[in-house]
């Protein structure tokens, strides 16, 4: 038995009304309006250079903790491959490699998430909330898993991913564009490192005696390798006890 992440459709009229309300609420913030004005044209040119439509219809963020990097991928439709648009620098990372399992451990989570909230009144300029804890975190973690994991501005973190204020201005504008263009679920996948030959060698060497982390990383490795080969995402699926599966 497997559990899968499902996306439910709404009527076009409701979706249009909801999108308009969401847009109006977002642009009450001068931070959002200023960010849009500053970065929207630049993003449009970068997408055009990659032959990807803008505003985007489908974007994907992929982060690597060891490298302090977050990649932006995009595609024109569900049948096409994602293209790498650019790579952002994560300003700081707290905790160690491995998933977040308990509240207050200062860990940046690892696994498969999506953006569930746009916070235009953040203490860190702007922020994008992830759906942590997801099903895997809830089943595999402590009863008190914590929450409030964001991609945000600034350069201070106790478990989030700070991108600097200019960085979050651009990323927020990008994600807001995708949301307003119909993408309700923007995937954000977080890995301990690039899971290529050298990355896996490092994990096997440094965490050879940590069977729990090794098992978890083997689950993430399958999704990483599939995307590297096809530039497409697998559906996020779990076993009843919270393990990721293809």
What are these regions (language model features)?
Residues 163:
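A conserved hydrophobic position in a structured secondary element of the catalytic/binding core
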Residues 190-192:
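Hydrophobic transmembrane alpha-helices
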Residues 1-19:
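Bacterial Sec-dependent N-terminal signal peptides
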Residues 16-158, 166-186, 195-246:
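Cell wall/extracellular polymer interaction/catalysis modules
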